[in-house]
């Protein structure tokens, strides 16, 4: 079996590339996916978002090694093992990232990936329902909507931010990210709008696109040229050959693993596992980054939260309405208000993100408070901690060793203390007076730096945004894995295009920029002239040097 292009992974970037590479009908594309079909309400119902990430049917089941700086806790790292990849198990929050994120990419060696370069690709992929005119795309495959914000708590959160002196923004994906405002969702007609729904399924209707179910074991190389992929399907091993290129889009965990299994990575590490060296790229598996967050929870004195919907009868009613009409509480992820703010004067653009939720519960649906409540998920966006993904053995079936080194930099602790205290300030504003009860978590007794640090150590959680393990950069950067056209340095006919190529994590959730990578990489692969650069200038707070708000 062979095709012009062989893509490993049907996730956010892989699906976008399958769509774009096959669009003109000239080239054939094979997408290799080990995961299951994305069918059923557990995947497609937005409110069921906590289920698939806890199920081995849909998730690769990765976890970090015990993390020494958070008390030896091992944090789960869900990655989608399903059509659509992690876009089929994520929280459906859509964030492009801040313009300065991409300018930093370009300045660090990923030339051609500045905000002016990537903004046209965000517009090309979007079908925005209500975003800022002129800044948003309206004809792309990816539907993006705002929640209805029927619950008054969503408006209280935005008003509280305004009362605390922060900016308000109507579209954090438009000209102005900084501020409090509505959250955007990848939901369409009451269903999760994953990369599979947006890109892969339309692509599979074309005669030149084929989906192959199989476990990718390694890249097949002839000398220093990639010519195919060895896959395992059942008990059968076979090679799918690429006439033009192999493109890895297997996630920030599996992409570096696959490179190393194929002889591309740190020479000493590969030798340790008896793998023949093809290209010594010490950056493979390094530069691992993520977002961490804590949940600040408050009792609600009025019975208006989702706590009323957590009983079995209400869940059944919500499920039936969604199955019949795709409406009601099942048709939203319930993240409908958000904020991006700066932690202190001298910070040019937001470095703290908020997700607001009208219920007090863990992201994975566990440990719900036994009362009406609301919560903010809050965390710093630019941690200085860095981790790694390395091989456990040369066996492709073994999960890799994942070490995030969470909270290993002292600045992370100061940033999180500020996040906790800032959230208390926001919840203490007059807008919450009609609703505010006692603090559930951390609890009023947690006040000193040491007490807050203990709370963080015990309760900090991943936001599930791993990236950076196949860093994009200049060809003379020894830690770069791919060049600015996503080509693996030192190997021909092989590219990586997914969140693993991010030089630095972006300001927000990663599904949006991952799809953008797939869109832009497609033009590089096809040899097209990139879309014309934008001349639109993003809003930067004129007081950023003297004030945090």
From Swiss-Prot:
Its cofactor is FAD. Pfam families: GMC_oxred_C, GMC_oxred_N. InterPro entries: BetA, FAD/NAD-bd_sf, GMC_OxRdtase, GMC_OxRdtase_N, GMC_OxRtase_C. Keywords: FAD, Flavoprotein, NAD, Oxidoreductase. The keyword Repressor does not apply. GO terms for biological process: glycine betaine biosynthetic process from choline. It comes from the Bacteria. It catalyses: choline + A = betaine aldehyde + AH2; betaine aldehyde + NAD(+) + H2O = glycine betaine + NADH + 2 H(+). It is an enzyme of class 1 (oxidoreductase). One of its GO terms (molecular function) is flavin adenine dinucleotide binding. PROSITE patterns: GMC_OXRED_1, GMC_OXRED_2. Its EC number is 1.1.99.1, 1.2.1.8. Belongs to the GMC oxidoreductase family. PANTHER family: CHOLINE DEHYDROGENASE, MITOCHONDRIAL, GLUCOSE-METHANOL-CHOLINE GMC OXIDOREDUCTASE. This is Oxygen-dependent choline dehydrogenase. It comes from Brucella suis biovar 1 (strain 1330). The lineage of its organism: Bacteria, Pseudomonadati, Pseudomonadota, Alphaproteobacteria, Hyphomicrobiales.
């Amino acid at each position: 079996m062979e095709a012009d292009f062989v893509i490993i992974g049907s996730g956010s970037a892989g699906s976008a590339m399958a769509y774009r590479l096959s669009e003109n009908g000239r080239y054939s594309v094979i997408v290799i996916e080990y995961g299951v079909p994305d069918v059923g309400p557990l995947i497609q119902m937005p409110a069921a978002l906590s289920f698939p990430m806890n199920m081995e049917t849909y998730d690769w089941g990765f976890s970090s090694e015990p993390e020494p700086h958070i008390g030896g806790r091992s944090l789960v790292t869900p990655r989608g093992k399903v059509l659509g990849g992690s876009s089929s198990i994520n929280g459906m929050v859509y964030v492009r990232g801040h313009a300065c994120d991409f300018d930093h990419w370009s300045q660090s060696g990923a030339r051609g990936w500045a905000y002016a370069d990537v903004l046209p690709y965000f517009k090309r992929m979007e079908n925005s329902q209500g975003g800022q005119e002129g800044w948003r795309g309206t004809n792309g495959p990816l539907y993006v909507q705002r929640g209805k914000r029927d619950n008054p708590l969503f408006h209280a959160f935005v008003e509280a931010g305004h009362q605390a002196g922060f900016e308000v923004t109507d579209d954090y994906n438009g000209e102005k990210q900084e501020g409090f405002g509505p959250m955007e969702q990848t939901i369409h007609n009451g269903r999760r709008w994953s990369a599979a729904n947006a890109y892969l399924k339309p692509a599979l209707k074309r005669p030149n696109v084929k989906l192959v179910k199989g476990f990718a074991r390694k890249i097949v190389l002839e000398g220093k040229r990639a010519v195919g992929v060895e896959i395992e399907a059942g008990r059968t091993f076979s090679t799918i050959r690429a006439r033009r290129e192999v493109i890895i889009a297997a996630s920030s965990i599996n992409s570096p693993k696959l490179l190393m299994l194929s002889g591309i990575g740190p020479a000493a590490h590969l030798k340790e596992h008896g793998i023949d060296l093809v290209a010594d790229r010490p950056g493979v598996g390094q530069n691992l980054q993520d977002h961490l967050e804590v949940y600040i929870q408050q009792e609600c004195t009025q019975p208006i939260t989702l706590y009323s919907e957590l009983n079995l009868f209400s869940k059944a009613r919500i499920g039936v309405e969604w199955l019949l009409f795709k409406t009601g509480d099942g048709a939203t992820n319930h993240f409908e208000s958000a904020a991006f703010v700066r932690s202190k004067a001298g910070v040019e653009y937001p470095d703290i993100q908020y997700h607001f939720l009208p219920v007090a519960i863990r992201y994975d649906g566990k440990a719900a408070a036994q009362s009406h409540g609301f919560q903010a998920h809050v965390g710093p966006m630019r941690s200085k901690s860095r981790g790694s993904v390395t091989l456990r053995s040369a066996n492709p079936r073994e999960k890799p060793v994942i070490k995030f080194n969470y909270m290993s930099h002292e600045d992370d602790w100061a940033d999180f203390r500020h996040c906790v205290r800032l959230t208390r300030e926001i919840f203490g504003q007059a807008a919450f007076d009609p609703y505010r009860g006692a603090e559930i978590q951390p609890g009023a007794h947690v006040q000193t730096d040491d007490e807050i640090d203990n709370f963080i150590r015990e309760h900090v959680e991943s936001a599930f945004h791993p990236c950076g393990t196949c860093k994009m950069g200049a060809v003379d950067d020894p830690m770069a894995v791919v060049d600015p056209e996503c080509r693996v340095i030192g190997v021909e006919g092989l590219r990586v295009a997914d969140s693993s190529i991010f030089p630095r994590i972006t300001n927000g959730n990663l599904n949006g920029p991952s799809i953008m990578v797939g869109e832009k990489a497609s033009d590089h692969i096809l040899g097209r002239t990139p879309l014309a650069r934008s001349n639109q200038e993003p809003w930067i707070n004129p007081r950023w040097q003297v004030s945090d708000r």
